[in-house]
């Protein structure tokens, strides 16, 4: 789930940046501090926007920089259990498929793709159904549901487990055929 979060912080403006527009300098500092990092309870920070920097700064003894209060917006992504997502198949392996969810990737275990018995063909890099003859391969567009999000080491992307074994989930081509 994407979130727009309003935040406040203190930004250090180094002396070599004095004279430049405060909001631009603060934006660069905030990007270095937060962007592409995982923050507890907030998720993966994708972008920093709408920076408003206080004109008045604070001097700290022994440091030539000024410190300014800033207000800004962050766009973050947090995978949520039960969320329905769509993405492109990035990789097909004998144990399942990896799906690009945008900022992160998720895994659909082979047992969670469909009710059919599935086989992996490593020569063609596909998974196919024994009875249905349905094929899934790299580049296919799929819809899935998040069934678990496992935290890893701090600062690392979480592992996202997906399922496609529910109505209106699966390869988008299969879903449109079912609707007809």
From Swiss-Prot:
Q: What is its EC number?
A: 2.7.7.6
The record, for Gene3D superfamilies, names: Nucleic acid-binding proteins, RNA polymerase Rpb7-like, N-terminal domain
Top class in the EC scheme:
transferase
Subcellular localization is given as: Cytoplasm
Q: Which reaction does it catalyse?
A: RNA(n) + a ribonucleoside 5'-triphosphate = RNA(n+1) + diphosphate
Question: What does the entry give for GO biological process?
Answer: DNA-templated transcription initiation
Q: Which positions form S-S bridges?
A: none
**Chief location category:** cytoplasm
PROSITE patterns xrefs: S1
Q: Which SMART domains match?
A: S1
Q: Which domain of life is it from?
A: Archaea
Domain named S1 motif is located at: 82-165
Q: Which GO terms describe its molecular function?
A: DNA binding; DNA-directed RNA polymerase activity
Summary of the function given for this chain in its UniProt record:
DNA-dependent RNA polymerase (RNAP) catalyzes the transcription of DNA into RNA using the four ribonucleoside triphosphates as substrates.
What UniProt notes about the protein's domains is: Forms 2 domains with an elongated structure; Rpo4 packs into the hinge region between the 2 domains.
The protein's assembly and partners: Part of the 13-subunit RNA polymerase complex. Forms a stalk with Rpo4 that extends from the main structure.
What is the name of this protein?
Answer: DNA-directed RNA polymerase subunit Rpo7
* Native organism: Saccharolobus solfataricus (strain ATCC 35092 / DSM 1617 / JCM 11322 / P2)
Encoding gene per record = rpo7
């Amino acid at each position: 789930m994407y979130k727009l979060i309003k935040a406040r912080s203190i930004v250090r403006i180094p002396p070599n940046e004095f004279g430049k527009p405060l909001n631009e300098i603060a934006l660069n500092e905030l990007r270095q501090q937060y962007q592409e990092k995982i923050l507890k309870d907030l998720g993966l920070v994708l972008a920093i926007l709408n920076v408003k920097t206080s004109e008045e700064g604070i001097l700290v003894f022994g440091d030539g920089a000024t410190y300014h209060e800033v207000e800004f917006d962050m766009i973050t992504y947090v995978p949520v259990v039960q969320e329905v997502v769509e993405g492109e198949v990035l990789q097909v392996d004998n144990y399942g498929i990896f799906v690009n969810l945008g900022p992160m990737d998720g895994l659909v275990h082979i047992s969670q793709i469909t009710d059919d018995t599935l086989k992996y063909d490593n020569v063609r890099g596909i998974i196919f159904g024994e009875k249905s003859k349905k094929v899934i391969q790299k580049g296919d567009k799929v819809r899935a549901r998040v069934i678990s999000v496992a935290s890893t080491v701090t600062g690392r992307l979480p592992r996202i487990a997906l399922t496609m074994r529910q109505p209106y989930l699966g390869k988008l081509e299969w879903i449109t055929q079912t609707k007809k």
